[in-house]
Structures are given as structure tokens and as C-alpha cells.
């Protein structure tokens, strides 16, 4: 698993090392920022000025024996990476592209200056007198998840904040805007074709239904190819399009489709048969399709190299990790991972029926992400509530942090966030999370489902007794901070 690669020492242990250099105001003032990216240098200077009081000169080339902070592109490496290199009189921050270089600067600010970007309404820049940096060390990081998305308006509405948390600022990056998911009806609209050509659609119980396409009909293939070409022509900067089933389970069971599905051991057989043919016509593009509900079980045939499998965990219990409570999904995930390295996970981390109700899935977020990464998931889309919900800011932050580095400790993330975002009230918010998770565990087996209802937990973690206890924790949390403070408003919003 491509995770945190540390050549000599891990960041969290740097503060304990004796092999360090202390940079105070005077010694740091001797440094120059060297880079061709003036905007990034200005960003670094903003934080240095606010934290330690230093604003460094900026040059675009290394000159003489000056001490420097070098912000450097290294395009020789094709895979995403960034690195922090510390030597006698230099700090070099590298990335293989502009985004990864920015991420490297943010890593430096976070790990060595203590900067935190908790939400769009709170950035913490500690006032410090010195920076402790390691001597003669390199820290190299290659993210195992290359496209990280948390379905939260905090990231969608503020691309700068998304950058700092190292996630995308749109739900479907690089996708054709009008063909992202459930697209069959967009390529061959039922209202346009069904009356004259019912044979284009699914055969079930002797009748053609305008539900899904017949994937072995050659005319359907040609129309979809033409439609895909038209979509790409209109949205020429996009590199990905979804060619995927509509949101129902009424797939075609004609003799030809059924023969393929039986041979392949899954209705995904006819889907991959069809999508591979589309993909061959667009070798420089990525064709995304769904492994969802009836197509979740993998077939025998491998998807082509430019096919992206979007595997959806919609059926799974969120009270326990997938590898413990959703064995069928785990089996399908492992099956797909043997067929392709192009897997995009569509995961679910909220309850669609009531976004504001408590949804104690805290203990499953990290193990589920770890499971996805271990099975070739290079893209992960965590479908959160998008709009404000229970502990919205914390959930957005925590999922982003774990997508960037799945090795992080979620309890440490929660403590860091609650202390920083809620001030002295944070300890009570953290206690609430701990307690509701404990009460869920006591109620097991309990199926925590995205289409469930809070009323199902009224005898368990949402019992009157438990609700009273949780309420008292928030009363204590509010009482611990000034009513006029931002902390108070954030606790009320939690």
C-alpha cells in the first residue's frame, strides 16, 4: 500500500529528535525563498509573518551560498508526490506538479509551524518564537488515494480551503458536466426513442421496458458512441465520462444479454462487454461505469485500461467496519481489485433520511478507507451531507485528513479538531462522540443504514436517557465558553 514513505524519520517524531536546527526570528531572517512560483512564495510568507514575524525575500534562482527555502517542481516523477528535504542551510519543498508542491508547503506549515485549517471560518496560526526542523532528513509522501473527494459544500464553495485539506473542490473532477452518473437515459432518451425503437431497451418478462438499455444491441452501441463523442466535443476539457446504468434494477434479460451475464457470473458481464467497446473508441479518455446494486458483483472479463469502475457501498451497515459487517461487498471489492487498478469508491457517510440526526459511524471511517486503499481504490468519493448536518465541520475535516493519509489516528484528529474549533468546550463534544459510539456498540447488532431512520435507535443510542446525557454534555460545552465567542456559535451549530 502506497502510504506514508519516510526515508529516515517520521514527522510526528521530529520534535523528539536531538538532531535538529532551531530557527528563531534572527536565524530564519537569513533565509531566502527561491521559486518560480511567486504566488506560492507569497503564501508561505503570509504564514511565516503571522507565526514568527519573518517575511523573507523572494528570488527565482539559487544564488551563491545563501540559506534558502526552495519551492521546486520535479516533473521527472510521474506519480503524485511531495517531499520536504532538510540540510545544513536549506529547506527544499518539492512536488511533481503545482498542486503537489502547494500541498508540500501546507504540510510544512501544518507540521512545523502548527498551522491548522479547521473550517472555512477558522484558520489557526500559532504565534511561535522558533521553528524546530530536522537536520539532514528527507520526508517523502506519495498519496495512496490520488483523487480525494468529500461531498461537503465547505470544499465545493471554497477551492482554497479544499486545497489546504488536499481534496477536490467538485464532486466529479474532470467529468463531463452532464454525464457523471446514471447516464443511459442521457445517451438514448426514452421519450425520444422508445416508441419507435423499443428494442433499444431492457427486455423483461417478454416486454421491453424504458428502464435500462439492451447492451447487446449494435444500434444502441453506435448511438451511445455518437452521444459520448458529442458530449466530449461540447465539454472538450473533460477527460472522464460516465457510461452507466440508470438508477433502477430493471436490466435487460434478453437471450443475448442473459447469455453473457450467465457466462460471466454477473449482470456486470454485459455491462463491461458494452463499456469496453465504448472505451476502445475513446482511448485518450476515461470511461467510468458503475458497480452498483445488480452490477456490483465483478464479472470474469477485465475492464479495459481506460475504464474506471465506480464501486458503491450503498447496502452496507455503518455501525461496524465493512470487513466485519459487509462481507459480500468486501468480496466484490477484492474481486474487482483483481481485475483492475482503476477503482473509484462511492462511499456513504451520512443518513439520507435525516441529515441532522446523530449518525455514529465514527469508528468505521478509517477502517473502511484502509480497506478501499488496500484493494486498489485510487479515487474515493465520500458522500457526506453536502449541506450542514451533525458535526458537519468535524466530519468534513476528518474525512479529508484520512483520505490524504489513511494512517492517521482518527482519535487524534478528533481531539485536535475539537480542542481547536470548540475551545474549552471541545472536551465535551469529544465526550459526546465517545459516548454515542459506546451506546451504539452496546446496542449491537444494530443496522446503521443510510436509508434508516433515527426512530430505530429510540431504544438504543437515542433513548430518552441517552439523549438527556448528550444534551447535558452540550450544555456543559456551551457553559465553558463565552456566549459572545465564536466558540459558542460553533458549539450551537454542532
Report residues per predicted region.
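Acidic, His- and aromatic-enriched active-site or binding-groove loops in soluble protein domains
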Residues: 261-278, 305-323, 403-409
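Catalytic domains of carbohydrate-active enzymes that cleave complex glycans
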Residues: 59-61, 403-494
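Substrate-binding cleft/loops of secretory-pathway carbohydrate-active enzymes
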Residues: 288-315, 356-364, 389-396
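Short, well-ordered secondary-structure micro-motifs within conserved domains or adaptor modules
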Residues: 48, 56-82, 152
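Sec-dependent N-terminal signal peptides
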Residues: 4-14
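Feature activates predominantly on carbohydrate-active enzymes
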Residues: 23-25, 30, 35-43, 47, ...
Amino acid at each position: 500500500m502506497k502510504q506514508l514513505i519516510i526515508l529516515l524519520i517520521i514527522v510526528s517524531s521530529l520534535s523528539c529528535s536531538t538532531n535538529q536546527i532551531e530557527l528563531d526570528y534572527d536565524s530564519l531572517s537569513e533565509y531566502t525563498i527561491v521559486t518560480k512560483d511567486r504566488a506560492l512564495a507569497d503564501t508561505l510568507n503570509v504564514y511565516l509573518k503571522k507565526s514568527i514575524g519573518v517575511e523573507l525575500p523572494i528570488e527565482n534562482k539559487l544564488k551563491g551560498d545563501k540559506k534558502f527555502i526552495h519551492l521546486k517542481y520535479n516533473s521527472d516523477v510521474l506519480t503524485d508526490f511531495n517531499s520536504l528535504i532538510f540540510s545544513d542551510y536549506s529547506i527544499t519543498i518539492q512536488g511533481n506538479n503545482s498542486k503537489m508542491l502547494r500541498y508540500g508547503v501546507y504540510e510544512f506549515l501544518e507540521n512545523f509551524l502548527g498551522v491548522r485549517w479547521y473550517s472555512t471560518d477558522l484558520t489557526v496560526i500559532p504565534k511561535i518564537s522558533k521553528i524546530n526542523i530536522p537536520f539532514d532528513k528527507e520526508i517523502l509522501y506519495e498519496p495512496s488515494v490520488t483523487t480525494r473527494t468529500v461531498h461537503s459544500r465547505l470544499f465545493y464553495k471554497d477551492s482554497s480551503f479544499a486545497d489546504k485539506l488536499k481534496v477536490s473542490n467538485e464532486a466529479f473532477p474532470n467529468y463531463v458536466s452532464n454525464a457523471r452518473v446514471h447516464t443511459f437515459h442521457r445517451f438514448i432518451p426514452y421519450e425520444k426513442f422508445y416508441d419507435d425503437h423499443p428494442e433499444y431497451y431492457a427486455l423483461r418478462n417478454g416486454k421491453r421496458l424504458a428502464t435500462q438499455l439492451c447492451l447487446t444491441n449494435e444500434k444502441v452501441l453506435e448511438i451511445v458512441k455518437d452521444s459520448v463523442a458529442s458530449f466530449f466535443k461540447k465539454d472538450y476539457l473533460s477527460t472522464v465520462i460516465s457510461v452507466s446504468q440508470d438508477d433502477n434494477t430493471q436490466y435487460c434479460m434478453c437471450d443475448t444479454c442473459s447469455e453473457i451475464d450467465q457466462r460471466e457470473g454477473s449482470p456486470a458481464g454485459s455491462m463491461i462487454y458494452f463499456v469496453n467497446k465504448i472505451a476502445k473508441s475513446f482511448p485518450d479518455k476515461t470511461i467510468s461505469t458503475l458497480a452498483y446494486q445488480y452490477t456490483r458483483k465483478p464479472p470474469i472479463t477485465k475492464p479495459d485500461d481506460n475504464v474506471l469502475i465506480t464501486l458503491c457501498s450503498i447496502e452496507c451497515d455503518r455501525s461496524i467496519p465493512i470487513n466485519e459487517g459487509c462481507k459480500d461487498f468486501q468480496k466484490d471489492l477484492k474481486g474487482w481489485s483483481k481485475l483492475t487498478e482503476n477503482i473509484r469508491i462511492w462511499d456513504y457517510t451520512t443518513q439520507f433520511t435525516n441529515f441532522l440526526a446523530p449518525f455514529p459511524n465514527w469508528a468505521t471511517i478509517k477502517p473502511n478507507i484502509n480497506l478501499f486503499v488496500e484493494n486498489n481504490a485510487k479515487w474515493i468519493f465520500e458522500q457526506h451531507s453536502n449541506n450542514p448536518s451533525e458535526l458537519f465541520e468535524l466530519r468534513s475535516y476528518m474525512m479529508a485528513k484520512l483520505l490524504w493519509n489513511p494512517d492517521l489516528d482518527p482519535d487524534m484528529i478528533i481531539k485536535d479538531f475539537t480542542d481547536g474549533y470548540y475551545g474549552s468546550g471541545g472536551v465535551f463534544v469529544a465526550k459526546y462522540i465517545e459516548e454515542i459510539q459506546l451506546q451504539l456498540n452496546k446496542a449491537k447488532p444494530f443496522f446503521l443504514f443510510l436509508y434508516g431512520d433515527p426512530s430505530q435507535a429510540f431504544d438504543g443510542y437515542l433513548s430518552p436517557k441517552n439523549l438527556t446525557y448528550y444534551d447535558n454534555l452540550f450544555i456543559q460545552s456551551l457553559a465553558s465558553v463565552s456566549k459572545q465567542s465564536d466558540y459558542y456559535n460553533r458549539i450551537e451549530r454542532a
